[in-house]
């Protein structure tokens, strides 16, 4: 039979109750956080998030919170670490599909659906933010969106961002895809698409799956040809952005446009 703590006031006696033990690898449920003992310090990710905010958590821990609990034989934190390592970055995770997630033995359809839903929310939020922005005068205004869309692709993608006369976003679309070493880009097709969108200005971008962002001689030649072709139809090429894994290169910032 349990007895009260006779040497302590009732409130302190109640506060001295230990939190129930949690199995290893399981994120603590919210209802377990309602009563905390005096001197308690947050250790688990959810506890630290509630105490200090999401910035206090690592990427692995944020992913672990999304997963919730581990599958039998698969620790949730180990699964989160493997995901971040496998996809190399959070941008890589945002590009992953449900099949990519379910290829990991620690993730089933339910957890895969949860991850895909969160990444799609992030993608839509960035798109909304880009549409709500003030006129765009630099590549930095759409850089995050471009990195999210094409930065983690294992193949090269050439994309165009169409802007109106006030440099507000009209649309963004992929023009072409290619191999790791070769991609065919036709300036006349980009000019045609700019006219279809009734664009007054354009930002083009392509990714380097290798991670290096230094433009090649062919990148510079293509940019000059595209600049001149767009000028013939009164469309201004504002920038050409090269996107790596964690860095970008702007032709405009380098003074090449």
Curated annotation (Swiss-Prot):
Which residues are listed for Zn(2+) binding in this entry?
A: 206, 208, 219
Q: Which Gene3D superfamilies match?
A: 5' to 3' exonuclease, C-terminal subdomain, Cytidine Deaminase, domain 2
Q: Which UniProt keywords apply?
A: Hydrolase, Metal-binding, Metalloprotease, Protease, Zinc
Q: Which InterPro entries match?
A: MPN (IPR037518), RadC_JAB (IPR025657), RuvA_2-like (IPR010994), UPF0758 (IPR001405), UPF0758_CS (IPR020891), UPF0758_N (IPR046778)
**SUPFAM superfamilies named in the record:** RuvA domain 2-like
**Motif JAMM motif, residue range(s) on this chain:** 206-219
Fetch the PROSITE patterns from UniProt: MPN, UPF0758
Q: Where is this region: Disordered?
A: 1-28
Q: Which residues form the MPN domain?
A: 135-257
Instruction: Please give the biological process terms from Gene Ontology that the record holds.
Output: proteolysis
Q: What is this protein called?
A: UPF0758 protein Bcep18194_A5833
What organism is this sequence from?
Burkholderia lata (strain ATCC 17760 / DSM 23089 / LMG 22485 / NCIMB 9086 / R18194 / 383)
Q: What is the lineage of its organism?
A: Bacteria, Pseudomonadati, Pseudomonadota, Betaproteobacteria, Burkholderiales
């Amino acid at each position: 039979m349990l007895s009260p703590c006779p040497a302590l006031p009732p409130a302190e006696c109640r506060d001295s109750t230990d939190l129930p033990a949690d199995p290893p690898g399981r994120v603590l449920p919210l209802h377990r956080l309602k009563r905390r003992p005096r001197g308690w310090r947050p250790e688990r990710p959810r506890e630290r998030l509630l105490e200090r905010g999401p910035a206090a958590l690592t990427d692995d821990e944020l992913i672990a919170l999304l997963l919730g609990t581990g599958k039998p034989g698969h620790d949730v934190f180990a699964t989160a670490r493997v995901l971040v390592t496998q996809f190399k970055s959070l941008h890589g995770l945002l590009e992953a599909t449900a099949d990519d997630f379910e290829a990991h033995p620690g993730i089933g359809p339910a957890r895969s659906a949860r991850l895909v839903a969160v990444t799609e929310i992030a993608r839509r939020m960035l798109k909304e933010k880009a549409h709500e922005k003030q006129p765009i005068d630099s590549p930095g205004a759409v850089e995050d969106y471009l990195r999210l869309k094409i930065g983690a692709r294992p193949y090269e993608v050439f994309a165009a961002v169409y802007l109106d006369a006030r440099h507000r976003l009209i649309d963004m679309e992929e023009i072409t895809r290619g191999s790791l070493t070769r991609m065919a880009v036709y300036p006349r097709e980009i000019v045609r698409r700019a006219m279809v969108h009734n664009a007054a200005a354009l930002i083009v971008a392509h990714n380097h799956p290798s991670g290096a962002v230094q433009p090649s001689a062919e990148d510079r030649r293509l940019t000059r040809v595209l600049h001149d072709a767009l000028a013939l139809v009164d469309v201004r090429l504002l920038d050409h952005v090269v996107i790596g894994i964690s860095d970008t290169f702007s032709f405009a910032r380098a003074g090449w446009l």
